[in-house]
Amino acid sequence: MAYQTALTIESVIKDIDSKKYLLPSIQREFVWSTKQIEKLFDSLMMDYPINAFLFWKVPKEKAKEFSFYEFIRDYHQRTGRHNPKANISGVDDIMAILDGQQRMTSLYIGLKGSYAYKTSHKRWDNPQAYPSRKLYLNILGESEDTDLTYNLLHSDYFRSKFHQKIYQKYYYFHKTQHIYQYQHIHRQDFL
């Protein structure tokens, strides 16, 4: 069994973006909840290992014998739960993910994508019932309330007076939204 060096989160995100990593048709669909995504990021922020990924290198000559799918980038509970089929024409060897799809998809959704799930007390056929949520991370310090440290929120969240107080006290919810778009900024710069 061959072992590779550790992957960086940045390289995983870039490889998903460039479609270097694809999912074989034998993979189940993305099923993680927002709480599971938050726990993954909690583990990362506490420097816990998140286990290994299992890759399957498929030579381009064999790739046409299989079906492959792309990663979900913006999960939507009603209209975006299925992975789009990958166009593999003109592609070199394919790196298929056999184990780690839930974690990789969660990393992508948490850092660049979004997660839309139905708001309670709204009709399933109402498009407004599925606000798009992004992950906000407190990378500057400890929160007094651990439930506020990581959370997938939609933009209407801070409209109530109670949530305005939280926003003022924990301003990093909004401020860190775009931090991962800048490659030259690192977590250590803020510590």
Predicted regions mapped to residue ranges:
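Basic- and aromatic-enriched surface patches that contact anionic nucleotides/nucleic acids
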Residues: A2-T34, E38-L191
